[in-house]
Amino acid sequence: QNLKLDLLTEVYAEIKMNNTTNQDAINNFIDWVSEISDCVNSDYWNGEDVMGIFFNEFNRYKKKSESGQVFTPDHITSFMYRLIDVTQNDRVLDAACGSGAFLVKAMCNMIKESGGVNSKKAATIKDVQLYGIEFDREIFALACANMLIHKDGKTNLEQLDTRSEE
């Protein structure tokens, strides 16, 4: 677990902040993040991929990825969850998890089915029923942060290449 926290610290330490004198914009951003946090921590949270939303917004200002990375919109993760008929007792593996959108959606829905975030089953879902693998180091850090924000603790995420035989 410490390796994942070290990776998060290293990757996010590279973020450079622009100096601004617009305190209102900063205050609005802080209020917005607080509002998102309140939604994520409620029993009524719908499993939005918060880090995916941030990632897509930030990437609008960067060159297109040469690696062909595509991040799945929320309506597609919801559709896929229903299509494969996941239940609270299933195990979910996303072998190219990106920002963790499918895992976040599955976790949210499975926990809802189990009685909410305070149910005994919720801890089991987070600890042993969700697995994610991501090759790209920075995207892996994004998935770890996303699962951490959603109270998973990034327990079963691994930075590996699922295309290799190792």
Where are these regions (language model features)?
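Long recognition/docking surfaces used for binding and targeting
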Residues: 1-60
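Conserved S-adenosyl-L-methionine
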Residues: 66-165
